[in-house]
């Protein structure tokens, strides 16, 4: 039984409140305590040795694990249907940890070309300095993913809902391609959260989240989470020496032999978090836990508000097109209805008539929407991707990702939808004055 295991409930809403935690046995505190401690006392020498030899559960140093973080990790793992998770300093740190655990110099990744700008930069510019190359492909083409695989490819990667074009990733089809080639499918599910989609149920093996967004929900912390589905058989694949060959850093331990379905997440913690140090602070974990407790209620309202706003923009004369997977005009509508039956999220983009100038005038006329580089806040947000979040991409890369000069991205919050629509209408009128 896990150290922090809560009641054996199965309902999603119940898990958001109880998974991974019981009342404190000493004080009776109902809320998860913040264990603001750098390190933890060993009761005796044998206990200490067991921790360092990975022979028992417990905490040594908060860079490796922390009791507050452990509750968050177990809670999100339960919500995603995984076998384990690691809380990281940011979503970028979670993505880097996944790649660094599986890849070495000379390895290769196949990724969707419709990605968050920071992830694109990591794959396109930073990782090649360490000998890891990435081929970017059309997220809607399963065959493009298949054709790009080489003998050195270690994983397929994509976002369930592409950023900012909202392309929907065909998880089941891509999982089949990945598994046929002997590699895992890694998915960023930040836009969806486990409330709207559980990627592991559709064949994904590893899930990455930016906890900064909808999981915490209020724009007050930076954090990430890496979830292991425990579904990939590392031992039968010949592509992963980091998991199937002796590791000198732990006396020739073979992670796949010793930990089975937990091999990936164990190495990620015992090596990646230990050596790269991108751990989450316990105060951050506490705030994310508070956000997750209301995740179902918030996501319902986010989706309801988004549908109202999308309907308004879709009929407005100043709008050329709206990119939201629930619209009949969206090419992935049918796939979205299967993968995301509760809704296609609260982030979407639209193209405004008049290009960059109109987009700038529109944004500067808004008073309720906040102009900033984030999503998933309780407050509604707006940004112009081509000049901000994706500005480091080349013109060709922007075009391939469908990011035009007039593209505006919205993250719809929890305000009254009528107020949001009024604010957007004012901005659209201002944008067309020339």
What are these regions, as identified by a protein language model?
Residues 44-96, 118-125:
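Conserved N-terminal alpha-helix of the aminotransferase class I/II PLP-enzyme fold
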Residues 9, 16-35, 357-397:
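C-terminal core of ALDH-fold dehydrogenases
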């Amino acid at each position: 039984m896990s150290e922090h295991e809560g009641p054996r409930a199965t309902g999603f809403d119940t898990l958001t409140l109880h998974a991974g935690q019981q009342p404190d046995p000493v004080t009776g505190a109902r809320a998860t305590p913040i264990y603001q401690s750098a390190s933890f006392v060993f009761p005796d020498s044998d206990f200490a040795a067991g921790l360092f030899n990975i022979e028992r559960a417990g905490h040594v140093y908060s860079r490796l694990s922390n009791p507050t973080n452990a509750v968050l990790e177990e809670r999100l793992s339960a919500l995603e249907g995984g076998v384990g998770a690691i809380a990281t300093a940011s979503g970028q740190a979670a993505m880097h940890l996944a790649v660094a655990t599986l890849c070495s110099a000379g390895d290769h990744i196949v990724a969707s070309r419709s990605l968050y700008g920071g992830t694109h930069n990591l794959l396109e510019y930073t990782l090649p300095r360490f000998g890891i190359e990435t081929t970017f492909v059309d997220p809607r083409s399963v065959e493009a993913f298949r054709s790009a695989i080489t003998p050195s490819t270690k994983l397929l990667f994509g976002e369930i809902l592409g950023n900012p074009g909202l392309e929907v990733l065909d998880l089941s089809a891509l999982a089949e391609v990945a598994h046929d080639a002997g590699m895992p499918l890694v998915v960023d599910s930040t836009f969806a959260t486990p409330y709207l989609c559980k990627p592991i149920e559709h064949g994904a093996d590893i899930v990455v989240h930016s906890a900064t967004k909808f999981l915490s929900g209020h724009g007050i912390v930076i954090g990430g989470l890496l979830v292991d589905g425990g579904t990939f058989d590392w031992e039968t694949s010949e592509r992963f020496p980091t998991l199937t060959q002796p590791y000198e850093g732990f006396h020739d331990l073979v992670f796949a032999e010793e930990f089975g379905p937990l091999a990936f997440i164990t190495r990620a913690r015992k090596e990646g978090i230990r050596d790269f140090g991108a751990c989450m602070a316990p105060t951050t974990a506490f705030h994310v836990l508070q956000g997750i407790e209301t995740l179902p209620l918030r996501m319902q309202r986010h989706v309801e508000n988004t549908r109202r706003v999308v309907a308004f923009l879709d009929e407005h004369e100043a709008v050329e097109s709206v990119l939201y997977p629930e619209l009949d005009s969206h090419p992935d509508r049918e796939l979205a209805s299967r993968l995301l039956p509760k809704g296609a999220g609260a982030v979407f983009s639209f193209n405004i008539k008049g290009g960059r100038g109109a987009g700038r005038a529109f944004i500067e006329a808004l008073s309720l929407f906040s102009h900033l580089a984030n999503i998933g806040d309780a407050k509604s947000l707006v940004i112009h991707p081509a000049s901000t979040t994706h500005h480091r991409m080349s013109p060709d890369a922007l075009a391939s990702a469908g990011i035009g000069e007039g593209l505006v991205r919205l993250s719809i919050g929890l305000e009254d939808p009528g107020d949001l629509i009024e604010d957007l209408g004012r901005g659209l009128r201002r944008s067309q004055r020339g």
